[in-house]
């Protein structure tokens, strides 16, 4: 599960400092404090523009993965919400809008629904097992007319309208999914950028646990930095902060850390 550790990198140049040993220790402590307090307070730099969303489910939300976690070839671009170990849970539209895309694949999302909202965002619901009747009817008609199962359907604007809280699909385990869950994304309408959904759903999630760091890495820039007389990287346990390291030049630091939430044994990436 090392791919769920997040390495928080901080760049600094200590070549001109008076006390190089103290500089590294104090810098690492600042990074650790930012990690802990950022996790406890829920610090986010993203501007939500005052948008509001309701919960996609009528039961308490628990996550199996969060936004930005490391994957073998990409960053995880949404929230994976647990569905109590089963498929078929009703999924509610998180805001008023219209169905802008219906996606059916063998892998990836499996079946996914895109709903465009007037507040500047589009919500994506992935790995669903089926859609609401009017959406399912539209999809089946398209599939029969084009004689294809796999498809990427784009209804006209406002052709299929939905209301906040309306059931739009049933949760599933379709596509590249390792177990029943809803993959929920938010994207900006103006440029398609992925947005972290977490700040919008904090009231539906219980999270009083701070991230836990386990390793610290020191990375000299080749030709520009040295740690303890060596150009090689040094990775040590978090308790090694009690030690002193001799360093010169330009150094990167990294922290391996995991985040946790209440009510579940899952661990998450930190960002």
What is the predicted role of each segment?
Residues 3, 9, 13-14, 24, ...:
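Intrinsically disordered, low-complexity regions enriched in small/polar residues
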Residues 1, 8-9, 13, 18-51:
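Bacterial Sec-dependent N-terminal signal peptides
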Residues 125-127, 135-138:
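Short, conserved acidic/polar surface loops in the N-terminal third of protein domains
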Residues 136-154:
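Intrinsically disordered, low-complexity Ser/Thr- and acidic-rich flexible linkers and loops
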Residues 179-186:
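Histidine-centered catalytic micro-motifs
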Residues 45-122, 129-131, 148-151, 155-158, ...:
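Surface-exposed, glycine-biased beta-strand/turn segments
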């Amino acid at each position: 599960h090392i791919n769920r550790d997040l390495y928080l990198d901080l760049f600094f140049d200590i070549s001109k400092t008076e006390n190089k040993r103290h500089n590294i220790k104090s810098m690492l402590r600042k990074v650790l404090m930012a990690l802990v307090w950022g996790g406890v307070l829920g610090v986010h730099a993203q501007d939500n523009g005052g948008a509001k969303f309701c919960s996609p489910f009528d039961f308490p939300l628990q996550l199996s993965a969060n936004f930005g976690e490391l994957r073998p070839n990409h960053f995880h671009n949404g929230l994976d919400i647990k569905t109590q170990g089963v498929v078929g849970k009703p999924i509610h539209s998180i805001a008023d809008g219209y169905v802008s895309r219906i996606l059916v694949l063998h892998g990836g999302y499996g079946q996914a629904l895109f709903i465009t909202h007037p507040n500047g965002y589009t919500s994506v619901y992935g790995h669903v097992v089926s859609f609401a009747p009017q959406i399912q009817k539209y999809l089946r008609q398209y599939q029969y007319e084009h004689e294809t199962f796999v498809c990427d359907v784009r209804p006209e604007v406002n052709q299929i309208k939905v209301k906040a809280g309306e059931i739009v699909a049933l949760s599933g385990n379709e596509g590249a999914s390792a177990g029943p869950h809803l993959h929920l994304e938010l994207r900006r309408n103006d440029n398609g950028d992925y947005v972290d959904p977490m700040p919008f759903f904090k009231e539906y999630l219980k999270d009083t646990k701070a991230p836990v760091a386990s390793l610290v890495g020191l990375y000299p820039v080749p030709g520009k930095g040295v740690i303890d007389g060596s150009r090689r990287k040094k990775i040590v346990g978090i308790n090694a902060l009690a030690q002193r390291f001799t360093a010169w030049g330009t150094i990167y630091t990294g922290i391996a850390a995991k985040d946790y939430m209440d009510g579940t044994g899952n661990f998450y990436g930190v960002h």
